[in-house]
Amino acid sequence: MSAKADIALIGLAVMGQNLVLNMNDKGFVVCAYNRTVEKVNQFLKNEAKGTNVIGATSLQDMVNKLKLPRKIMLLVKAGSAVDDFIQQLVPLLSPGDVIIDGGNSEYQDTARRCDELRAKKILYVGSGVSGGEEGARHGPSLMPGGHPEAWPLIQPIFQSICAKADKEPCCEWVGEGGAGHFVKMVHNGIEYGDMQLICEAYQIMKALGLSQAEMATEFEKWNSEELDSFLIEITRDILNYQDDRGYLLERIRDTAGQKGTGKWTAISALQYGVPVTLIGEAVFSRCLSALKDERVAASKQLKGPNVNAKVEDLPKFLNHIKHALYCSKIVSYAQGFMLMREAAKENNWNLNYGGIALMWRGGCIIRSVFLGNIKDAYTRNPQLSNLLLDDFFKKAIEVGQNSWRQVVANAFLWGIPVPALSTALSFYDGYRTEKLPANLLQAQRDYFGAHTYELLGAEGKFVHTNWTGTGGNVSASTYQA
């Protein structure tokens, strides 16, 4: 059989199948392969019946069916499975062929694979794929990075199958090495933050006595304003959903799962020294939710405030919640972009931040009108150091911050946990504070560990004080704090 496939895809779980069908719809001939060959046969007989998709019975068979330079996309479980397939593929490939990892790989693994395959003259791309099963079928957000020479080879396919926002593709080259998977990781972390903020708004509304129908109406209203987004939209739908037993939401166990990508973002923030506090709290909130049995026991023993959530003007307070959610969302994205900026500096990536915002405008879980405002901010000033300093976002927080403070303060007085809303406000106040109490912290470190400190006006010169008159004058070398 002559080589006629434009691209091969390995891994026929639902995401893989949907991407194959998406590529087929856009006029590309796809060769489908799965480690279990029977899955290929079933796919061709069922979901891919009547399409131009062709199957392969082995990796060699798949390679033989591909046009040169070959393009092979892996959609398999992150980790050793990716390395195993790469190891099997390399002997079958020619210099200049392209391997694309479309799974949720850790960006360090992608960077390592780029280095390893560069030496073997194979081009490698690590691409974030967002949008879930529906996005894969009808248009995902794609975030490719790796060997830049691979981009012209895969660009026609990627920009054809991806989502479009204002007729622009939600896919652009991100950067070298692990840049694509890093940006996807931050996207997932921001997703954690957005979801947690919405959950906190829901919990406050619930405490105020709103019915699910009333909450759904409020989310519907927000979705027609500045909070217009996929997650607000689906929250409305979830609140409205009823089965034969009534509203489903209240019967769902309040223990949240996680696949680890939010945790990776929080860990990266610590490694790069960037205060991505909201995503961190969103991850920890899921961890706390998992302690269901302990929380049930604690609810019977630990006392809180003896007041019920109550406001004089409910519509006005619901508007406060909307502003609090919006201001916190601005902080969350500002923190995410801070993390990407620092990682870009450390890894020599030339990231296009406005382009990244555009990539997230459609096809992905965090898609929202708000991302267009971020794109505009970086168009106005490509060197913008922080989104909070952009005129549009400054004005938005100026308008909403009194509401934000009202909501957080009342939640505290009512004993309602709002870790994401409150940490966002604390970050905002910390970021706008000229002088933080870290001078005392430095003095403490120097007192017990001789870690030294800098004096105002003498930056770069580190000094130590003998605070008790009994210690020495040398700085610490072993005790770190």
Curated annotation (Swiss-Prot):
Recorded metabolic or biological pathway in which this protein acts: Carbohydrate degradation; pentose phosphate pathway; D-ribulose 5-phosphate from D-glucose 6-phosphate (oxidative stage): step 3/3
InterPro entries in the cross-refs: 6-PGluconate_DH-like_C_sf, 6PGD_dom2, 6PGDH_C, 6PGDH_Gnd/GntZ, 6PGDH_NADP-bd, 6PGdom_BS, NAD(P)-bd_dom_sf, Pgluconate_DH
SUPFAM superfamilies: 6-phosphogluconate dehydrogenase C-terminal domain-like, NAD(P)-binding Rossmann-fold domains
Binding annotation for NADP(+): G11, L12, A13, V14, M15, G16, N34, R35, T36, V76, K77, A78, N104
EC number of this enzyme: 1.1.1.44
Keyword Lyase: no
GO molecular function: NADP binding; phosphogluconate dehydrogenase (decarboxylating) activity
UniProt binding sites for substrate: N104, S130, G131, G132, H187, N188, Y192, K259, R286, R445, H451
Chemical reaction(s) catalysed: 6-phospho-D-gluconate + NADP(+) = D-ribulose 5-phosphate + CO2 + NADPH
Active site: K184, E191
Keywords: Gluconate utilization, NADP, Oxidoreductase, Pentose shunt
GO annotation (BP), single: pentose-phosphate shunt
Biological role: Catalyzes the oxidative decarboxylation of 6-phosphogluconate to ribulose 5-phosphate and CO(2), with concomitant reduction of NADP to NADPH.
Subunit structure of this chain's protein: Homodimer.
Family: Belongs to the 6-phosphogluconate dehydrogenase family.
Protein name stated in the entry: 6-phosphogluconate dehydrogenase, decarboxylating
Organism: Ceratitis capitata (Mediterranean fruit fly)
